[in-house]
Amino acid sequence: MVTAFLNERQATTEEMALVSNALAAYSFIADQPERAALYFVCGVCLGLVLTLIALVVQISCRTDCKTQQAPKKTGKTVENTSDTSDSDSDWDNTSDLSARRHRRFERTLGNVFTSAEELERAQRLEERERIIREIWMNGQPDMPGTRSLNRYY
């Protein structure tokens, strides 16, 4: 009976603490709305940054793990059949690492344009921008003051 009363009283105090904390938060927001808004925006921004970091780490780890698993299987067969010196194998490992990084970079570039039409459209846009830049550079009016300063202009 006494334990039931203590448990009920403890539950009541926990509920009262929750209500008290909610009222304290409301009074803080009512007294200082700018500060509360600043804390809210900072919390949202921090959450977005942490989510972005988690996504970047997940994507980079996923691509690194996939590229590391494939060479391990082929690397054992290559090590058993090769009779080269240690310096040559070190050079092979570094070149293999750079080749893997290059392939990963090319793979990300390849995923940007999913179809040939998008690739062609992007190339036409780049060409158009280059032509506009050339027209802009060549179409500037000649200023008499700058011509007299440099005879090779």
Curated annotation (Swiss-Prot):
What InterPro entries does the entry give?
A: EVA1_A/B, EVA1_dom
- Residues annotated as transmembrane: 37-57
Q: Please verify whether the record's keywords include Transmembrane helix.
A: yes
Pfam families assigned to the protein according to its UniProt record, in alphabetical order: FAM176
- Cellular component per GO, a single term: endoplasmic reticulum membrane
Where in the cell? Answer: Endoplasmic reticulum membrane; Lysosome membrane
Task: Name where it mostly resides.
Answer: endoplasmic reticulum
Alphabetized UniProt keyword annotations? Apoptosis, Autophagy, Endoplasmic reticulum, Lysosome, Membrane, Transmembrane, Transmembrane helix
Keyword Translocase in annotation:
no
Superkingdom of origin organism: Eukaryota
In residue numbers, the region (Disordered) covers: 66-97
* First and last residue of the signal peptide: none
Q: How does it sit in the membrane?
A: Single-pass membrane protein
GO terms for biological process, alphabetical: apoptotic process; autophagy
By sequence similarity, the record places it as follows: Belongs to the EVA1 family.
Protein task: Acts as a regulator of programmed cell death, mediating both autophagy and apoptosis.
From the Swiss-Prot or TrEMBL record, give the protein name: Protein eva-1 homolog A
